[in-house]
Amino acid sequence: MAQVMDFKVADLSLAEAGRHQIRLAEYEMPGLMQLRKEFADEQPLKGARIAGSIHMTVQTAVLIETLTALGAEVRWASCNIFSTQDEAAAAIVVGSGTVEEPAGVPVFAWKGESLEEYWWCINQIFSWGDELPNMILDDGGDATMAVIRGREYEQAGLVPPAEANDSDEYIAFLGMLREVLAAEPGKWGKIAEAVKGVTEETTTGVHRLYHFAEEGVLPFPAMNVNDAVTKSKFDNKYGTRHSLIDGINRATDMLMGGKNVLVCGYGDVGKGCAEAFDGQGARVKVTEADPINALQALMDGYSVVTVDEAIEDADIVITATGNKDIISFEQMLKMKDHALLGNIGHFDNEIDMHSLLHRDDVTRTTIKPQVDEFTFSTGRSIIVLSEGRLLNLGNATGHPSFVMSNSFADQTIAQIELFQNEGQYENEVYRLPKVLDEKVARIHVEALGGQLTELTKEQAEYIGVDVAGPFKPEHYRY
């Protein structure tokens, strides 16, 4: 166990309110609740010490308590400075104890962290006293990056200085590593050796994992949870379809019907965005670099354009690419007066927030938390949500519980798979086995009252599958 019950959250007095919300979410998260029942006696995560970094929401609270119910010890931070629901964080810290004597899980997260505080929190999930974490559960790859780059700079004996074009966040990251190197030399190398595996939640984090693997610096096996079908085709699309509109409504009360909307990117998240706006009666255009995705958008009835072509007429612009430099400062200058700009990709670098926040000829007016008006020297202004970070979590509470039950059941199963099968996986990136993906889907089909058709032995043999599945080959595209 960690030496002390340490934590840092906004307000422990919010714990009771958080507990009520967690109980409600449990009814909408059948995947996690089923896993608790199935593995209660087996305790497959007994001995696991999980460093967790996922948005500290009510749904994540159900995930955390599922991991601990299966035997794990956990320390937790959020993966975004704005996404924490403070009542959920408080409830997890208090656990079965009281506000005066909390007895839950150490959480280091609160809504509205500074960048320096954010990286301090990430460091805390790796600080286990006399022990070391042996599993990582990540969203966006920041926790994994801390271990890999931290070890690299330890070996070099120096954390490099920030460069002129480095983001404020990366500068804060280097500052954290510099402090740790001075105070705890060798920390990251020890952690890299102790960790049995990492499970990664998002597209952005998965890209980082593949990059680390190509570099030859991935020190442990990684499970790509994002590309599990029950994650990418449900969380990314259906979750976004719900939470994007929720975020915009809470932020602005803007009517979307009849508005010109530009969605940048038509992957699974972009598809959810376009469908959401279409359902509200907006006129949707899409930007896309991939010709296959672009063709899908056209066949779905959307115009495919470039940013430069469509930015001047757009009332709402949403980035959903997982890439960087999608909306430049020059393009923002061309936007309609009081047009809305937001991002639903993992990081804030899809929009040139650096220019908005640091240029002398731009004036910032905070309308309310995570809603800012930026006025240009021309007199025109735009409304930016969550400082260019995930608006569905900064301006709302993220995806609904049921869809997160899919994703977090995948995470739990992936943690069990890597933890129990040490030595069977190389230091590479793996997909969640199809049989486990189908298991998660089956639980949720039953929860929604669906009735699955059972193949006869002859039918199964005819298409070359087992009667119980898996029903599709790994390469099948759903």
Curated annotation (Swiss-Prot):
Quote the record's binding site residues for substrate.
T57, D139, E201, K231, D235
According to its UniProt record, this protein's enzyme class is: hydrolase
Cellular localisation: Cytoplasm
Q: Its annotated pathway?
A: Amino-acid biosynthesis; L-homocysteine biosynthesis; L-homocysteine from S-adenosyl-L-homocysteine: step 1/1
Q: Which CDD domains match?
A: SAHH
- BP-aspect Gene Ontology terms: L-homocysteine biosynthetic process; one-carbon metabolic process; S-adenosylmethionine cycle
List the EC numbers from the record.
3.13.2.1
Residues annotated as binding NAD(+) are 202-204, 236, 265-270, 288, 323, 344-346, 392
Name the reaction it catalyses.
S-adenosyl-L-homocysteine + H2O = L-homocysteine + adenosine
Q: Which cofactor does it need?
A: NAD(+)
Q: Which UniProt keywords apply?
A: Cytoplasm, Hydrolase, NAD, One-carbon metabolism
Q: Which GO terms describe its cellular component?
A: cytosol
Q: Name one GO molecular function term.
A: adenosylhomocysteinase activity
- Which PANTHER family does this one have? ADENOSYLHOMOCYSTEINASE (PTHR23420:SF0)
Tell me the protein family, please: Belongs to the adenosylhomocysteinase family.
What is the protein named? Adenosylhomocysteinase
- Species the sequence originates in: Corynebacterium glutamicum (strain R)
Instruction: List the lineage, top down.
Output: Bacteria, Bacillati, Actinomycetota, Actinomycetes, Mycobacteriales
